[in-house]
Amino acid sequence: MREPKPDHEQRGIQSIEVGGQLLHALAHQGRPMALKDLAAAAGMAAAKAHAYLVSLGKIGLVEQDRSNGRYGLGPLALQLGLMSLQQADPVRLATPVMEDLAQATGHTVAMAVWGTHGPTIVRLAESPAAIHVNMRHGTVFSISGTASGQLFAAHLAESLVRPLYEAERRAAAGQASQAGSAAAKLPSWAEFAKTTLLEVRAQGLGRSEGTVVAGVSALSAPVFDQRGQPVLALTVIGPSAALDSRWSGALAQQLRSAAAALSARLGFRPGDLPD
C-alpha cells in the first residue's frame, strides 16, 4: 500500500491558501474592513483580493455590508467558529502542552480546574527529575497559599472564591491559636485581594515560594475560554533552588506563552477579560 507523503511534501490548493490570508486578516482585526485595508493586511493587490472575496462571499465565509462596503466574516465562518468551540476540550488540548512543558523545563507540571472545593488537579506531567511532593489526581489546592489557588481567586467571581478563602482563614487562625502564635494567620479578604490578587492580575501568573511545602516553589498561568473565564491553570512546580520564579524570568515567559496559545485556541482574545 502506498504510504502518505509527509506534511511538507503534500500538495495543497494554492487558491484556498491565498483566500485564507484574507480570512486570517479579518479574524486578526476583529472588525469589518474596507477592501483597501483588508487587501493590505493580507499582502495582496485590491483587485486580487476583491476576486477572492466574491468567491468567499458566495459560500458564506465573508459578507459585505452594503451600507458602507466593508467586509466581515460571514454566517458560515460564524457557524464553523461555534462548532470549533463546542468541540474544543480544554483538558484534551492542554495535555500535550503540559507534557512538553515538563520536558522543556525539567519540572513537574500540574493542570488544575475549578472544582467544588477549589482548584483541583486533573492531570500531572512528571518532570524528568521528579520531586517528592505529595500530589495526585484529585488533590485540591488551597486558595491562600498556592499559585493555582491565587490564580483562580484573581480571575473568578468573589462569590465563588471568598467563602473558601474565609474557611482557610478560620482554620489558620485556629491552628495559630492552638500553637500560641499569630504566625500562621492569613490576612483579611480585602487585604488579600488588594495585594496578592492585584499582583497576580498584573503579572498574569500566580506564584508561591515555599509557602505550601518548604523548598518547593510554583508558577501558574491561566487558560481562558471565549468568554474570558479561566477554565484551567497550568502550574509548574519544582525545587525552589532550581525553579526560576521571577516574574520576568525565562520560565515565566515560557509559561505565559503556552497558556496564551491555548487560550487563543479556545477562542479567547486578550480584550475579552471582564472588568
Residue positions per predicted region:
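N-terminal helix-turn-helix
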Residues: M1-V91, A260, A264-F268
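Short, acidic, Ser/Thr-enriched surface-loop or helix-capping motifs
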Residues: I16, R66, W114, D225-Q226
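Short amphipathic alpha-helical signal-transduction/dimerization elements
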Residues: A27, G149, A153-A157, A252, ...
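Short glycine-/small-residue motifs
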Residues: L61, I121, L232-A233
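Amphipathic alpha-helical effector-binding/dimerization core
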Residues: S67-R170, G174
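Cysteine/selenocysteine-centered motifs that mediate thiol-based redox chemistry or coordinate metal-sulfur cofactors
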Residues: P163-G180, R256-D275
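Extended hydrophobic
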Residues: A182-A258, P274-D275
